[in-house]
């Protein structure tokens, strides 16, 4: 299933924090403490393939997977949807294993095999007992290098993906965020959807699938990741055995050149009015930060200050942020969610609003943007400390299990080339001050162009110029 959801939980792509010193007089049957010795190791093979892992000697299971620096952004308008289509075909048989043999082999191990596609990455991974890791790596290499891509399988999956596309169109949040990308990055690779338009899904050919593999599944764009009870040296040996014949690089193409060009953020809006939908669903964003930007963590802290709100929760009046308190007091929204979505060279920082108070849509948007402009000049240390505490807690909670750790390693190595140490992450977050937040807001929010995506009963949403004007209006 493609990973299309853009809403960022506070820990998207962030890292674990190492534990303290191990007490040599550990009580019997205690859960083994990780200590400070656990670290991420990396090795690069001769063909450029990176192997990265975090070994936990007490873990009974491991997650291994291949993170590929290619997603829908690496496609053209004509081939949009190819990466996701390939993900569906991955488990439909290889030159060595039929689909039934593949499924039976995974089932007999009690393992889990999965894949997903995003705008910038394609990922294939497996979770299994430590002793079955070599079998899983063998299966992964077989899928990546020997998939048959039979015409019969392509036609079957074509129908499956078309039905999936119909289901996605029923999910308002997905629709709003897809349109947000489309308007913010108009006529650029990052503005395309992951599934692709239906006409592409109907027309994608085997040749296009093969060409996508040839142009993107190369060693310089791939990272073999391991997390759990698999030693790094063992993973390197398996990588050398199974992936040493991968081509080092791909031929330069117009699609590859375009995909690496930093996209322009375009202030604009897209509105789809449908009064049969009982709510107004609105996303507003400014240009955010990339994964490697110096302001990445400041952006996350600023996002946490704006916060989230859900009227249905029992603690709705007390969800921490000033905006959530104001929205609840005046009954302006059903929910809202702040987000900071990052890519390799750009990002989207904003808020997603849902309300059934259709005569107060303008008030909701106005006071949300008033909160944004407040951040430019009036942020207290107390709310910054609360946001930092939330962020650090969310980081740890998001890294529960080997699959989450593998995801973090793979994403970081693919996008930035290194995995930041846990101590470094904590130090950076702790160093963020109220002044840093205000500096970030003045640079990224104050009087900046915005992208707006709105779906549903949106008659009450004012015109773009009026909303854009709120980006430079004093909060006082």
From Swiss-Prot:
Active site, renumbered: 87
InterPro entries according to UniProt: Metalloenz_LuxS/M16, MPP/UQCRC_Complex, Pept_M16_N, Pept_M16_Zn_BS, Peptidase_M16_C
Subcellular location: Mitochondrion matrix; Mitochondrion inner membrane
Main localization of the protein described in the UniProt heading: mitochondrion
GO BP: any one term: protein processing involved in protein targeting to mitochondrion
Catalytic activity: Release of N-terminal transit peptides from precursor proteins imported into the mitochondrion, typically with Arg in position P2
Topology term for the membrane: Peripheral membrane protein
Subunit text: Heterodimer of mpp (alpha) and pep (beta) subunits, forming the mitochondrial processing protease (MPP) in which mpp is involved in substrate recognition and binding and pep is the catalytic subunit. Component of the ubiquinol-cytochrome c oxidoreductase (cytochrome b-c1 complex, complex III, CIII), a multisubunit enzyme composed of 10 subunits.
Co-factor: note: Binds 1 zinc ion per subunit.
Protein name as catalogued: Mitochondrial-processing peptidase subunit beta
Example of a GO cellular component annotation carried by this entry: mitochondrial inner membrane
Cofactors demanded by this protein: Zn(2+)
UniProt KW keywords: Electron transport, Hydrolase, Membrane, Metal-binding, Metalloprotease, Mitochondrion, Mitochondrion inner membrane, Protease, Respiratory chain, Transit peptide, Transport, Zinc
Keyword Mitochondrion: yes
Family: Belongs to the peptidase M16 family.
Biological role stated in the UniProt entry: Catalytic subunit of the essential mitochondrial processing protease (MPP), which cleaves the mitochondrial sequence off newly imported precursors proteins. Preferentially, cleaves after an arginine at position P2.
Any one GO molecular function term: metalloendopeptidase activity
Regulation acting on activity, per entry: Binding to mpp is required for catalytic activity. Inhibited by metal chelator ethylenediaminetetraacetic acid (EDTA).
Gene3D superfamilies (alphabetical): Metalloenzyme, LuxS/M16 peptidase-like (3.30.830.10)
EC number: 3.4.24.64
UniProt keyword Zinc present: yes
């Amino acid at each position: 299933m493609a990973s299309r959801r853009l809403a960022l939980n506070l820990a998207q792509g962030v890292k674990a924090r190492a534990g303290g010193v191990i007490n040599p007089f550990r009580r019997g049957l205690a859960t083994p403490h990780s200590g400070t010795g656990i670290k991420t190791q990396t090795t690069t093979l001769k063909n450029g393939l990176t192997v990265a892992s975090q070994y936990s000697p007490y873990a009974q299971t491991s997650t291994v997977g291949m993170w590929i620096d290619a997603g829908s952004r690496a496609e053209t308008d004509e081939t949009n949807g190819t990466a996701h289509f390939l993900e569906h075909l991955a488990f439909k048989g290889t030159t060595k294993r039929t689909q039934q043999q593949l499924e039976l082999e995974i089932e007999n191990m009690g393992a889990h095999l999965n894949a997903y596609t995003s705008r910038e990455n394609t990922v294939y991974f497996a979770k299994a007992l430590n002793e079955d890791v070599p079998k899983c790596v063998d299966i992964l290499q077989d899928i990546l290098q020997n998939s048959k891509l039979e015409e019969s399988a392509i036609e079957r999956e074509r129908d499956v993906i078309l039905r999936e596309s119909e289901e996605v169109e029923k999910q308002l949040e997905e629709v709003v965020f897809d349109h947000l990308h489309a308007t913010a990055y108009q006529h650029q690779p990052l503005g395309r959807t992951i599934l692709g338009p239906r006409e592409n899904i109907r027309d994608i050919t085997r040749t296009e699938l093969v060409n996508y593999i040839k142009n993107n599944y190369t060693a310089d764009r791939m990272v073999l990741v391991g997390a759990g009870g698999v030693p790094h040296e063992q993973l390197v040996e398996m990588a050398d055995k199974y992936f040493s014949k991968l081509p080092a690089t791909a031929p330069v193409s117009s699609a590859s050149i375009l995909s690496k060009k930093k996209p322009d953020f375009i202030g604009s809006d897209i509105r789809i009015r449908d009064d049969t939908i009982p709510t107004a669903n609105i996303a507003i964003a400014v240009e955010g930060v990339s994964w490697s930007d110096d302001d990445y963590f400041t952006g996350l802290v600023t996002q946490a200050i704006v916060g989230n709100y859900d009227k249905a929760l029992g603690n709705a009046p007390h969800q921490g942020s000033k905006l959530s308190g104001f929205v609840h007091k005046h009954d302006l929204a059903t929910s809202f969610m702040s987000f900071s979505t990052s890519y390799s060279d750009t990002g989207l920082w904003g808020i997603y609003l849902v309300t059934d108070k259709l005569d107060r849509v303008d008030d909701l948007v106005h006071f949300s943007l008033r909160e944004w402009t407040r951040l430019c000049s009036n942020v207290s240390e107390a709310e910054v400390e609360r946001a930092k505490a939330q962020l650090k807690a969310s980081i740890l909670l998001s890294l529960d299990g080997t699959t989450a750790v593998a995801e973090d390693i793979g994403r970081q190595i693919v996008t930035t080339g290194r995995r930041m140490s846990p101590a470094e992450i904590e130090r950076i977050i702790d160093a963020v001050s109220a002044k840093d937040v205000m500096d970030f807001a003045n640079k990224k929010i104050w009087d900046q162009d915005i992208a707006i995506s709105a779906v549903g009963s949106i008659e009450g949403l004012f015109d773009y110029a009026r909303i854009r004007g709120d980006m430079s209006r004093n909060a006082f």
